[in-house]
Curated annotation (Swiss-Prot):
It comes from Synechococcus sp. (strain CC9902). Part of the 50S ribosomal subunit. Disulfide bonds: none annotated. GO terms for molecular function: rRNA binding; structural constituent of ribosome; tRNA binding. GO terms for cellular component: large ribosomal subunit. This is Large ribosomal subunit protein uL1.
Amino acid sequence: MPKLSKRLAGLASKIEDRTYGPLEAIALVKDNANAKFDETMEAHVRLGIDPKYTDQQLRTTVALPNGTGQTVRIAVVTSGEKVAAAKAAGAELAGDEDLVEAISKGEMNFDLLIATPDMMPKVAKLGRVLGPRGLMPNPKAGTVTTDLAAAIKDFKAGKLEFRADRTGIVHVRFGKASFTADALLENLKTLQETIDRNKPSGAKGRYWKSLYVTSTMGPSVEVDFSALQEIGQEG
């Protein structure tokens, strides 16, 4: 088992072995995010699902109300005059067969790939390149669409695609350590509601098993997910 660095061990010693209320957990992680850069805040949710079964898979999007604090580089595979329209809407890269060819050769200078339905037969051939990176466009994720301008705007504003990994854990960045605790809580609450709203039909037993929040270089803190779910339900 790898040893914790002295710095991380020192930070972890400030955290008690218990679950924390959502706002308290966020404040604690923020307090420990003291690297020389603006650390990314991450949520790690263990769900009671087995994604090897199709009715227990989770893949969707969340529109974080306060954004992620990160610049998203978007590439669009489309055709005709829509190529210029995609660039005008804010896409860093846009093209048709030429972009498909570039991607097939390993040119991946983007964080998100959007495609129009007419180009999906060509994009589908890139599965070996895009699949392992989680970049294959998908209608459920809003990355296969005819409304390119709206999709580009939404993803630039903080819309995120996420999925449960093969062990049933969801990993999502939900802001920066420089955000206020209230802004981060609002983002985390939106994520929780999205996960609950998209509960797979085949999920059995307890859906939420654990929730941890952490920063890029900091220790993780366990959050009382029931308290998070109860926010806004008072009265």
